[in-house]
């Protein structure tokens, strides 16, 4: 009986350990080629003309989008007069940020789910992507708030991001990766850790925009990173159940799509857009990850592998 009881206990412990492992999936960091990554280069004015009607059509089909947008419009009307905004920044851009940062509903999650999976083809985007106007307004808001030039205009933002439900791991140091969605981060490490520790990111972003003044939750001191920014993996370690990832922006974006709503087809490669003053094209040399050890690369001494296939 003692042996049977012991075997039963061991069996339960094994099942519990297996459940814990499966409860936090491991996802590889990559260039996520199926992300819808349009940056609307050269067509932002035409998209501004079309996005208003497009938004009305999409709100008619999506109740949560309509409710969230209308609530954010009201909040923006009270917030707007307190803000100093860049030239070209319109009410729709501010409302889009307030819609995204309102985590009291699931719309931000639904948007990012669509972004991560909606870039298989232009046909897929046109038929099934339900947030075309919101994606445009949010992308444009970040471009206007951040300004052109990336880190050639300044050192960028050092930010942190905590994830509680997923383990993200790079394949190797020196890889180029994208986050593949609109990614919330904070300049305050303590704030970021409140969102989880399964994976903890340390990042330097050149295209993420500080949105604290526009956010529904300004105390989070948020910097919002666009889906198409390219990062260099400079560090990875595991501390028990926690993965710690260090990403250093290469001061570059890349996109498979450009002006898709206006007819632009998906391109085979991820076409890079370099910021002014960016270093020359990088070497493909990289170091392999070693399990259980902390590996770090000095981003000033390592060049990035090509962003597109």
Swiss-Prot record:
Statement: the UniProt record of this protein carries the keyword Membrane: yes
Pfam families xrefs: ART (PF01129)
EC number: 2.4.2.31
Cysteines engaged in disulfide bonds, as pairs: 43-259
Annotated binding of NAD(+), by residue: 100, 161, 181, 215
Tissues showing expression: Abundantly expressed in testis. Lower levels in cardiac and skeletal muscle.
GO CC, any one term: membrane
UniProt cross-references to SUPFAM superfamilies, sorted A to Z: ADP-ribosylation
Keywords: Disulfide bond, Glycoprotein, Glycosyltransferase, Membrane, NAD, NADP, Nucleotidyltransferase, Secreted, Signal, Transferase
Protein's cellular compartments: Secreted; Membrane
Positions of the TR mART core domain: 63-253
Main location: secreted
An example molecular function term from Gene Ontology annotations: nucleotidyltransferase activity
Carbohydrate-modified residues: 102, 197
First and last residue of the signal peptide: 1-23
Catalysed reactions, as listed in the record: L-arginyl-[protein] + NAD(+) = N(omega)-(ADP-D-ribosyl)-L-arginyl-[protein] + nicotinamide + H(+)
Residues the record marks as active site: 161, 184, 222
Keyword NAD (UniProt): yes
Family: Belongs to the Arg-specific ADP-ribosyltransferase family.
Protein name listed in UniProt: Ecto-ADP-ribosyltransferase 5
Organism: Mus musculus (Mouse)
């Amino acid at each position: 009986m003692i042996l049977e009881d012991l075997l039963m206990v061991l069996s339960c412990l094994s099942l519990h350990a297996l459940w814990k492992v499966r409860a936090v999936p491991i996802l590889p960091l990559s260039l996520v080629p199926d992300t819808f990554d349009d940056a609307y280069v050269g067509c932002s004015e035409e998209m501004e003309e079309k996005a208003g009607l497009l938004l009305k059509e999409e709100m008619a089909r999506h109740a949560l989008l309509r409710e969230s947008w209308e609530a954010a419009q009201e909040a923006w009307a009270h917030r707007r007069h307190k803000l100093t905004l860049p030239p070209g920044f319109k009410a729709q851009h501010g409302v889009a940020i307030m819609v995204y940062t309102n985590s009291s509903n699931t719309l931000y999650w639904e948007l990012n789910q669509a972004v991560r999976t909606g870039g298989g083809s232009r046909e897929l985007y046109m038929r099934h992507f339900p947030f075309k106007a919101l994606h445009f307004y949010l992308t444009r808001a970040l471009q206007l708030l951040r300004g052109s030039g990336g880190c050639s205009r300044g050192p960028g933002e050092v930010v942190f991001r905590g994830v509680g439900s997923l383990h993200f791991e790079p394949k190797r140091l020196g890889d180029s990766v994208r986050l593949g969605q609109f990614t919330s981060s904070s300049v305050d490490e303590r704030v970021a850790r409140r969102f989880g520790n399964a994976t903890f990111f340390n990042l330097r972003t050149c295209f993420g925009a500080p949105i604290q003044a526009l956010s529904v939750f300004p105390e989070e001191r948020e910097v919002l990173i666009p889906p198409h920014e390219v990062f260099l993996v400079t560090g990875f370690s595991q501390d028990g159940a926690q993965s710690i990832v260090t990403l250093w922006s290469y001061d570059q974006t890349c996109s498979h799509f450009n002006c898709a709503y206006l007819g632009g087809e998906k391109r085979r490669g991820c076409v890079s857009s370099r910021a002014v003053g960016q270093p020359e094209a990088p070497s493909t040399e990289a170091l392999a990850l070693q399990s259980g050890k902390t590996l770090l690369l000095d981003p000033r001494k390592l060049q990035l592998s090509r962003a597109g296939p």
